[in-house]
Amino acid sequence: MATPALISETEAWKDLKAHLEGIKRTHLRELMGDTERCQSMMVEFDNIFLDYSRQQASPDTINKLYKLAEAAHLKQKIDRMYNGDHINSTENRSVLHVALRAPRNSAICSDGKNVVPDVWNVLDKIKDFSERVRNGSWVGATGKELKDVIAVGIGGSFLGPLFVHTALQTDPEASKNARGRELRFLANVDPIDAARNISGLNPETTLVVVVSKTFTTAETMLNARTLREWISSALGVAAVAKHMVAVSTNLPLVEKFGIDPNNAFAFWDWVGGRYSVCSAVGVLPLSLQYGFAVVEKFLQGAHNIDQHFSSAPFEKNIPVLLGLLSVWNVSFLGYPARAILPYSQALEKLAPHIQQVSMESNGKGVSIDGLPLPFESGEIDFGEPGTNGQHSFYQLIHQGRVIPCDFIGVVKSQQPVYLKGEVVNNHDELMSNFFAQPDALAYGKTPEELKKENVSEHLIPHKTFTGNRPCLSILLPTLDAYRIGQLLAIYEHRVAVQGFVWGINSFDQWGVELGKSLATQVRKQLHASRVKGEPVEEGFNFSTKTLLTRYLQATTDVPADPSTLLPNI
């Protein structure tokens, strides 16, 4: 019998569809009353505790999801990824971000070559360079130590490293290592972002890390040229080689730019941008800020989850369980979004990073073979740390649209605070909300309960909570570099599981190309209008032509061939 072309054509998918109606009729109040069920939906690995008992699912649902995973050949697809097969078929590439955090003595191959030695050559180079910068043996053009770093990149070259940086800022070991140092990220081509990044910094003490694999990324290279001008106008052109380094494989363009190619740190085609935080893209700026030893612990944490993901049975495999539950919520229950709600301010940049990892990976409308998908796939990811989110969008989550939620809690705060006379300490106050919110979503509050509380009749509809809103809880013991690495890898692999089950390519991103190509046409028109005074004519629809003309008419003061003007803030 031929293998179905789409996962939705399998008996396992059809079985889940038939099972769906019974689950829809069962409220979480009833499901949560079954202690045995709840116990079966709790998993622990390396002191990370996952409780998914508040999902709209029975043990039978979970077993059917395992059968769906089997029908999708999930285990074989995971193995193919780890074996270096070209699972990114549209670009004919391996997908080996797991190799970036593999121990030195590991063997992970791409096209028959063990790539781990290459990874460690770069890591050793980063360790040596970052230690020389940090101990003052590598100095700037005027002999001053380089205490400030601006990492220039966009997308995966920015969001992942920013997440890890923000998470480490208040970790005791990391913050001690970073004392007197500053790390900033320049991503947006908007000149305001450049202005904010250089504000308060001295070119003499600043090192710029330019992150672009090809050294041709339009936004990144314009920002890099802006910072090159900032440095050279203050210190002279020769200073660029002392104040700028690159994460790139295009050494001729790196050298042409003015950066010593010996100060270029490589990464490879088998590393996708959104999965590159464990490469030089993230490791270099983070090591400059926190020291290589701290970043190495982060890599070890990610590797720990890599091993768990590749070896644990599905019923104990945290990324697999999370991925299967997401498929259930999106493709069967019809919930298009997911809220990522970390009850730790240190994780404030987790949701924006996972937003990219998830939505760029799985925001696809066709299968890996190019067939249109007859079911919903991909999630709209967003989030905010608790308790801030409670005073922002939780209203909708409780009484508006149903949005499955990930609650992430940490047992021990990075920065505990105790105040004499308070009922609970600050972290306990935070965690009180972490434990309460999932129950509020699951159970809700009925009109009958409100009547017993003597709530006015006219307010009862407004104060009723339907409940039956799915969520899950992840409890981490601490939030140090190792645990941050684990959390990152859990979410990376969760996204892969979803894509493997849906049968899509989670590792390309053709959807970003069309807008970029259209921007090229606009850029040419802006140049022609500024330099030659040409009106906006052919090639644009009426709406775009109107907007462009309005923009140009309002900016006639912009010189056609300006002298250099840098931000002044």
UniProtKB/Swiss-Prot annotation:
Question: Which GO molecular function, any one, fits this protein according to its record?
Answer: monosaccharide binding
Give the signal sequence positions.
none
Annotated EC = 5.3.1.9
Tell me the domain of life.
Eukaryota
GO CC entries = cytosol
List locations, semicolon-separated.
Answer: Cytoplasm
**Record CDD domains:** SIS_PGI_1, SIS_PGI_2
Entry keyword set: Cytoplasm, Gluconeogenesis, Glycolysis, Isomerase
- The answer on whether this UniProt entry bears the keyword Cytoplasm reads yes
User: Which Pfam families does this chain map to?
Assistant: PGI (PF00342)
Biological-process GO terms, alphabetical: gluconeogenesis; glucose 6-phosphate metabolic process; glycolytic process
Q: What class of enzyme is it?
A: isomerase
Active-site residues are 360, 391, 516
Biochemical pathway:
Carbohydrate degradation; glycolysis; D-glyceraldehyde 3-phosphate and glycerone phosphate from D-glucose: step 2/4
Membrane spanning segments where? Answer: none
Q: Which InterPro entries match?
A: G6P_Isomerase, G6P_Isomerase_C, Phosphoglucose_isomerase_CS, SIS_dom_sf, SIS_PGI_1, SIS_PGI_2
* Catalytic reaction annotation: alpha-D-glucose 6-phosphate = beta-D-fructose 6-phosphate
Q: Where primarily located?
A: cytoplasm
Quaternary structure, per UniProt, is: Homodimer.
Alphabetical list of PANTHER family matching this protein: GLUCOSE-6-PHOSPHATE ISOMERASE
Q: Which family does it belong to?
A: Belongs to the GPI family.
Stated name of the protein:
Glucose-6-phosphate isomerase, cytosolic 2A
Q: Which organism is it from?
A: Clarkia lewisii
- What is the gene called? PGIC2-A
